[in-house]
Amino acid sequence: NQVIAATPKPLSLKVAQTPPNEWGLYDMCGNVEEWCLDWYGPYIDKEQTDPVGYSDGIARVTRGGSHNTPVKYLRSANRMAMLPEDKHTMTGFRVVQAEYPQTAPLSQPKDEYVVSQIKWDWNSQCVTEPVFAAPLVYVHEPDVHSGTPFFKHNHQPALTWCDNGDLLAVWFSTNEEKGREMVVLSSRLRAGSCEWEKPRMFYQIADRNLTGTALLNDRQGTLYHINGVEAAGHWQNLMMTLRTSTDNG
């Protein structure tokens, strides 16, 4: 039972009460979500036979669900994601004995986004007079063909400075604040620029609500990103995750 509750109650774990699917597996759409061995990553634009996913990543695939799981996420074709360190009442696993495919795993797409690593001289930019300027909008719609998801509700920003002089802003983009479609996007105001860049994907755990984001520069060369990750939708059972960057984000 996947009702989102702050205090989950014990439920029956009895299985195999309905017929199995074509592969002889019971309860693929009637019990808890189940871990898959695959690392989560984007689909590639070509046919594959016996795909085994990616060789690495930050989250692994889960599938399935139970009563009160929205049908969109309950479909066997739907791939959710979950951090390997996470655990909660909505996800379990099973052992299936079969020959492992010989297909080679995919490599994660290379991020070619370039950020300056030259340390900014803050003292050279010091001013002693008041500065007045119009606000700079940091939430822009992404390019249509960029592949960056962008929803109608963009909210809860966090912002910090980078050692290279850039400003980094992040926020969540979603249709509903309780939604599982939520992603965290980022934009950068590069040193000397007067316009924030188009948004990029900053953090995504597919089909998990990601309410709660913070950024911090520790003044010793490290940026900290703290973010909540839900068991499903809503924001009642969030765990806190931490990532660091030593290359200006």
Segments from the language model and where they lie:
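Short, well-ordered surface patches within globular domains
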Residues: 1
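Surface-exposed recognition segments
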Residues: 5-13, 17-18, 22, 28-110
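Asp-box/BNR beta-propeller blade signature and adjacent active/binding-site loops
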Residues: 106-249
